[in-house]
């Protein structure tokens, strides 16, 4: 599953999807059981404009860790990929956005974003091999 992070959390669409995905398998017992009978690996990919240090300072990791914990509880295993300091706009000149260093954003997009995309691809390959 994937979502951009807006205002510190995943989009409403992703939250709604996850609630509908998870709820039918919940068991309210002391063991935190699940009605999902198989074990599958799940992945969560988040993109955000915040830099890594900003993400940590604002506590994004805590809320995202809860989602990973619930996915692990229900489906067996989960991992997250956090992609930070991404583009918010294709053209920064069209928006009031003077807090961003556009040259740094462009450099990061050119140098780091392809690596993040490769990490996401590699995650998918690992999952396919495990499930295969």
Residue ranges and their predicted role:
Residues 1-70:
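Helix-loop-strand module that forms the ligand-binding subsite of alpha/beta enzymes
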Residues 67-132:
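Glycine-rich phosphate/pyrophosphate-binding loop and the adjoining helix
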